[in-house]
């Protein structure tokens, strides 16, 4: 599965503020909104493993992720190839280090849905975009999000696992029945991050492709 497609499809969940939520309900949507609104920045290392429909491993990778809300995201893959995905909320850069090539394009054009509008910040909007259920345990909570817009988001469902109010695992099933599991470790929430981490200025010699 193409990791870029997964990440772009999910950007709206993490990048855009969910502040200002007021609800007397204690349903899955409200609980997820409250958890996501707890952080301004998020840093972690990740390990990814992807299985095909027959549960065969087809991809593994590891690296780090950095998020600053609203709108900024940096995903660095160290292995099997070095790749950096950066957005400041407006422009998306995908830099393939080994190829010395960077792709630049407006973020909204990467998917049929503008990530900025995916979650606009209210329980009502979450319910309009997704069917959300929760599977709680004594020390964790796992939310499943099924998009109402189906294939236009490149995935069938997402599962977000929170332990001690921190996002520790994300599982995605795509339209090809491929399942990717992202496990996060060394998590830092609301630690200072420089805004320069979310800007990309190609060095001389890097081939830039605009889309």
Swiss-Prot record:
Gene3D superfamilies: Lipoprotein localisation LolA/LolB/LppX (2.50.20.10)
Main subcellular localisation: periplasm
GO biological process, one term: lipoprotein transport
Localization, UniProt: Periplasm
Subunit structure: Monomer.
Record NCBIfam families: lolA
Protein name: Outer-membrane lipoprotein carrier protein
The gene coding this protein: lolA
């Amino acid at each position: 599965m193409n990791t870029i497609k997964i990440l772009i499809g999910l950007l709206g969940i993490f990048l855009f503020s969910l502040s200002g939520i007021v609800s007397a309900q204690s349903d899955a949507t409200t609980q997820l909104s409250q958890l996501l609104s707890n952080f301004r920045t998020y840093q972690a290392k990740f390990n990814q493993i992807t299985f095909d429909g027959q549960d065969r491993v087809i991809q593994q990778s590891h690296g780090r992720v950095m998020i600053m809300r609203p709108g900024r995201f940096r995903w660095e893959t160290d292995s099997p190839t070095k790749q950096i995905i950066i957005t400041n909320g407006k422009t998306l850069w995908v830099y393939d280090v080994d190829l010395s090539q960077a792709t630049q394009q407006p973020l909204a054009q990467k998917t049929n849905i503008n990530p900025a509008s995916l979650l606009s910040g209210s329980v009502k909007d979450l319910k309009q975009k997704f069917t959300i259920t929760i599977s709680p345990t004594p020390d964790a909570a796992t939310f499943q999000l099924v998009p109402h817009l189906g294939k236009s988001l490149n995935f069938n469902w997402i599962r977000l696992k929170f332990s001690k109010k921190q996002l520790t695992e994300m599982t995605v099933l795509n339209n090809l029945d491929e399942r990717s599991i992202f496990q996060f470790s060394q998590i830092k929430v609301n630690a200072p991050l420089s805004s320069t981490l979310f800007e990309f200025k190609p060095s001389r010699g890097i081939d830039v492709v605009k889309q």
